Amino acid sequence: MKKLMTLAFMAIALTANAQEKTTIEVPQWVKNIKFSGYGMLQYQGQDPEGNATNSFNLRLARFILDGKIGDFDWRAQIQGTNVKGPGEPTVQLVDLYAEWRKYPEFKVRAGQFKRAFTYENPTHPITQGWRAYADVINNLSGFGDRTGEKSSGGRDIGVQIFGDLFPNANGRRLFHYQVGVYNGEGVHQKEKDNRKDIIGGIWVMPIKGLRIGAFGWTGSRGDMTMKDADGNNVTGSVSKNRYAFSAEYSQDEYMFRAEYLHSQGFGSGKAGNNTVDYSLGDLADGWYAFGIVPVIKGKLHAKARYQCYRAQKEWGTSKSSYEAGLNYFFTKNLEMHLEYARINDRKLEKSDYNLVDLEMDFRF
């Protein structure tokens, strides 16, 4: 009898313990956290006269945490790349922001994130489809910006409001707006001249997959070394006044995009440099257009791109390229990109040269 009572008490204790364990719940915000990322491996060769190169390259790696807390989404994204050059890797936090998304008509984002300028800038490198962003995007959207801002991946620190308006009978919204206020100095940089950058954009979406828009940007970059009226070096700010016109169609694996960008304002012309180079002038512009179409849906895409960047808004300073290639998808998480470019750089004595790029990209 005593043994039976002991066994009974043990059974009750085990049952109670099991019930206690089942009542422990993980908070919903923890359940909502998602980890993802991707890597891009690259081989690139080019043959400009006197400066031919070919090299394997770790283009970049991204590690992404996304989460949701009530009506707020948040993201933290770390990037590793050899942006400084072979043997000089850079690992940094590129995105850290929270976003209030209760209403589709009005959303708010705050932190460090992509500037609200152009269609291409916010695109992930792995989904952008090319060996690099267009030259005009790199120079006028805060990558290796012509002002001298260090490479910031098109990002800045600030606050942005945005939303989609005017739903049609099918619920598809026809108009998008976005306006942001930023420090204007790039990633991990505090304000240097107490003058904020204001960037805005609007676009219409008349049919599914099509959007046509325009963007504007006014601001400054502080802590620049420049000349005063007497030729003495002084510290001050340079202006950034820019606009862009954009069009894109993306539907059923077909992607076509074209953008024109214009910039007014002096700069150093070199990323990470704070000395104004007046010989570069205060005007620059550029454009690109590309098409990516399915040859075998879900497996093989063909692509072509034309781009031009004029560092002084003159043809004598233009760099143009004509590009063609293929993107092959082994699975949805593994793809290979092949690209050939014929480049004309008028700043070189022998302006024409070739470039070949091969990439293996994966997602997780």
Regions found by a protein language model. Name each.
Residues 1-4:
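Positively charged n-region of N-terminal signal peptides that target proteins for export
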Residues 6-8:
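Sec-dependent N-terminal signal peptides
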Residues 22-184, 192-196, 203-212, 290-294, ...:
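Outer membrane beta-barrel
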